[in-house]
Amino acid sequence: MKNTIAPTCLVLIIACLSCCACTQSGTAGLHLNGTWQLVTGMTITGKDTVPYAGDFRMIKIINDTHFAFLRHDKNPPKDSSNHFDAGGGIYTLSGNQYTEHLDYYSDRNWEGKPFTFTVEVRGDTLIQTGIEKVDAAHIDHIIIEKYVMVR
């Protein structure tokens, strides 16, 4: 009986470590932490593709558990149409599936909703593709954004 306890414990320890290694290896290749500046973005609704990012600056800040984004007009008008946009919350990352759980946003229709993206990092470039669907705001489109790491 004593001879089977040690091998059994060893097998259980190896199994536990293997599970942990599998969980971490799925995201080991992706390094999202940092400050990212939006370079290009587009939305696709049906057959309509609308590029954006030319008239404003946007950054996304990601740490181990949270994300935030900040956006403002490049050339702000002198009247009340000056626009600033911000949001943030927690995120999860499983393999290349990045899900933002939007806890704070200037348009409350978006709050409390998860948005899942497929992410890819190439050097200092982050590309995220996903679907934004917010019934209350009449939003249902594919979104593709390309960011570059701010140094």
What are these regions (language model features)?
Residues 1-31:
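Bacterial Sec-dependent N-terminal signal peptides
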Residues 19-86, 99-151:
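Lipid interaction determinants
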